[in-house]
């Protein structure tokens, strides 16, 4: 049963739901890419002021990073909001077939329109509680840009922004009501920009120094490195600039972007150093030079089982959302467009046979269009292969 304080929080959220739903819809329409979320940031800044938060813009020198705070004293609780979109995923809301708002435009494939709005709702509810109770404590909503690319939270960590917090909370839209657990890979991205000497490939090749050759030799070197990595490591690359489209020219410029992953950030740093050495070797072999441009890096997430337990207890007490017939019909239509039972994303359903048994029973063997139940409690240190800059807050 919910305490009187928690009943007040629930009533606040229910009463203000349309306000925050409208924010989510507007962010869906803005759909701005990482570190370019200018309209989205402006919308949130306006709403924070409207809600009575003290606002700080351009946190850590990042144009679209900001925060809104309320209260005084401890504990200091940070609630993280994200709002960046992904390229090429523009989509009209409520439709189950591809139908972009802007052909070729960006869209919210990861639901960050909901993530930011939901986090703001949580911060506003805590503010209302502090106002009504008169108790000490500070709540801070952080507008965190560049989660999809740019690792905004990592640069905010570099400036020591998270040190003032006693706890930080975040959430992510998904197809299950659950407490997230486990960790993820750390990651580093570096761009290598090679420079050589142009020449005619037929008439004067001996005076040319090919930057494109350097990129290709670097890629070959990394391929041979793969055998000597530990199994948890990954290396990915994309040639971002071939120098030109004329094969009869020795290309003087070429670039390649590398991403390395490992379970621990210290191991990513070691692996990245080996990739750096391969770039040096490629330049030496081709008589070229290169510029190393650090793009971003993220640490692994450190799970906090105490907070996980508190979250789960409150989710049990408050219950899961209910859905009307129209929402269930839309969910069923969406589910029909992709394979799987819809339970694959539930924590523990793959790793733990007992959890899987419970989930199958609750989901009707995966037949339900929506997972309208609270997933069983599950804590783990298992590793997700992807990355998130939330790790740099943990």
PLM region spans:
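Generic structural signal for residues in well-ordered beta-strands
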Residues: 55-56, 139-141, 237, 290-292
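Metal-dependent amide/peptide-bond hydrolase catalytic core
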Residues: 216-394
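A non-catalytic, amphipathic alpha-helix used as a structural packing/dimerization or gating element
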Residues: 8, 12-22, 39, 43, ...
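Short amphipathic alpha-helical face segments that pack within enzyme cores
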Residues: 117-125, 213-217, 392
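Divalent metal-coordination and catalytic microenvironments
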Residues: 27, 68, 79, 112, ...
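Conserved short loop/turn motifs at secondary-structure junctions
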Residues: 32-33, 142-146, 295-300
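Acidic/His- and Gly-rich active-site-bordering loop/insert found
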Residues: 2-108, 113, 117-121, 125-138
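Histidine/acidic-residue-rich, glycine-tolerant segments that coordinate divalent metal ions
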Residues: 64, 86-88, 95-107, 113-114, ...
């Amino acid at each position: 049963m919910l305490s009187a304080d928690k009943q007040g929080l629930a009533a606040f959220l229910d009463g203000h739901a349309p306000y925050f739903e409208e924010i989510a819809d507007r962010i869906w329409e803005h759909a701005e890419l990482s570190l370019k979320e200018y309209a989205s940031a402006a919308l949130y800044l306006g709403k924070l002021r409207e809600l009575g938060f003290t606002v700080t813009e351009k946190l850590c020198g990042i144009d679209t990073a900001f925060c809104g705070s309320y209260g005084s004293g401890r504990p200091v609780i940070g609630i993280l909001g994200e709002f960046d979109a992904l390229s090429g995923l523009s989509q009209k809301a409520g439709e189950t077939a591809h139908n972009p708002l802007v052909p070729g435009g960006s869209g919210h494939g990861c639901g960050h329109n909901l993530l930011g709005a939901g986090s703001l709702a949580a911060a506003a509810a805590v503010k209302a509680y502090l106002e009504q109770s008169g108790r000490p404590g500070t709540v801070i909503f952080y507008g965190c840009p560049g989660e999809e690319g740019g690792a905004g939270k990592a640069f905010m960590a570099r400036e020591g922004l998270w040190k003032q917090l006693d706890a930080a909370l975040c959430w992510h839209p998904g197809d299950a009501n659950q407490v997230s657990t486990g960790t993820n890979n750390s990651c580093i991205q570096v761009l290598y920009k090679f420079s050589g000497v142009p020449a005619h490939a037929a008439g004067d090749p001996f005076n040319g120094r090919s930057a494109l050759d350097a990129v290709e030799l670097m890629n070959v070197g990394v391929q041979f490195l793969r055998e000597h990595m530990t199994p948890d490591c990954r290396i990915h690359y994309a040639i971002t600039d071939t120098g030109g489209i004329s094969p009869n020219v020795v290309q003087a410029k070429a670039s390649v972007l590398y991403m390395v992953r490992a379970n621990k950030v210290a191991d990513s740093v070691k692996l990245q150093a080996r990739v750096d050495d391969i770039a040096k070797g490629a330049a030496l072999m081709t008589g070229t030079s290169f510029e190393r441009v650090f793009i971003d890096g993220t640490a692994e997430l450190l799970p906090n089982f105490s907070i996980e337990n508190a979250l789960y207890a409150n989710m049990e007490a408050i219950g899961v959302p209910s859905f009307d017939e129209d929402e269930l019909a839309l969910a069923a239509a969406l589910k029909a467009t992709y394979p799987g039972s819809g339970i694959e994303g539930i924590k523990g359903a793959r790793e733990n046979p007992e959890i899987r048994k419970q989930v199958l029973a609750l989901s009707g063997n995966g037949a339900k269009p929506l997972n309208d139940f609270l997933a069983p409690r599950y804590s783990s240190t298992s590793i997700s292969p992807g990355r998130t800059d939330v790790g740099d807050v943990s």
